[in-house]
Structures are given as C-alpha cells and as structure tokens.
C-alpha cells in the first residue's frame, strides 16, 4: 500500500531542514487517544487541534522540486522513473543532463513518497531549494 504523505519522522526531518510549513497540504495531529491522525487540510486550517505537525503529499513534494538545476554551466532536468526488478516496482527521482550524466539520483524505493522525500532532502541540503 502506498503512502499518501510524509510520515511523522519524514515531516520532522523536513521541518529540521527548514522547509516552509506553508508548502504542506496536510497535517498530523493528536486525537483524543493521543494517536497521530492525518488531517487532509493544510496546517493553517487545523488551528483547533493539538500537537500539529505539517505533512506533505506527493503533489506538495513535487511542487517543491525545481524543473531544472544549473550546475557548472550544465543544465540538469528533473526526471522520474518507475521501474521493475526482482524486488518488484520501484520509484526513483533525479536530475539528469542531456549528456546522460546525473547530478543526483535517489535510491530505488517501493513507495514514491519515500523517493520524493529523499529528493527534497538532497535539494535542501545542497542549497538547490
């Protein structure tokens, strides 16, 4: 089963990296049993809930990724892959030049949100966003 947004751990990592909470389109909050629940509204619409943490859907994560990156006068375009191997379907994101060289490529993930999360972390850590 594919995730629909970042996990609590991933959301906390994105906050640590300084990703703007206004880019999140969902939020995690505590319910009356102190269990995390996912709310399909931006965190700004969850003012009445306790202990809110923003969450990013795949769409929100993709929206953070630049269409291309210029590095050393080489243009790297955003690419995404869905492939199959002996482990089943896998997802990957990266930035690739027209000369088939990669600036960065994520690991292969069974869940597309996990691949997008790794890409956002790399982009932020390398000051590309």
Task: Describe every region a protein language model picked out.
Residues 1-129:
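Glycine-rich anion-binding surface patch
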């Amino acid at each position: 089963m594919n995730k629909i947004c970042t996990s609590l751990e991933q959301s906390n990592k994105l906050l640590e990296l300084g990703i703007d909470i206004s880019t999140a389109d969902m939020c995690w909050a505590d319910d009356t049993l102190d269990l995390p629940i996912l709310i399909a509204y931006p965190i700004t619409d969850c003012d009445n809930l306790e202990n809110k943490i923003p969450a990013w859907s795949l769409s929100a994560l993709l929206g953070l990724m630049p269409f291309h990156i210029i590095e050393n006068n080489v243009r790297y375009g955003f690419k995404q892959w869905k492939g199959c191997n002996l482990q089943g379907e896998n997802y990957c994101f990266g930035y690739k030049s027209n000369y088939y060289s990669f600036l960065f490529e994520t690991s292969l993930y069974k869940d597309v949100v996990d691949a997008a999360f790794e890409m956002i972390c790399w982009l932020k850590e390398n000051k590309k966003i």
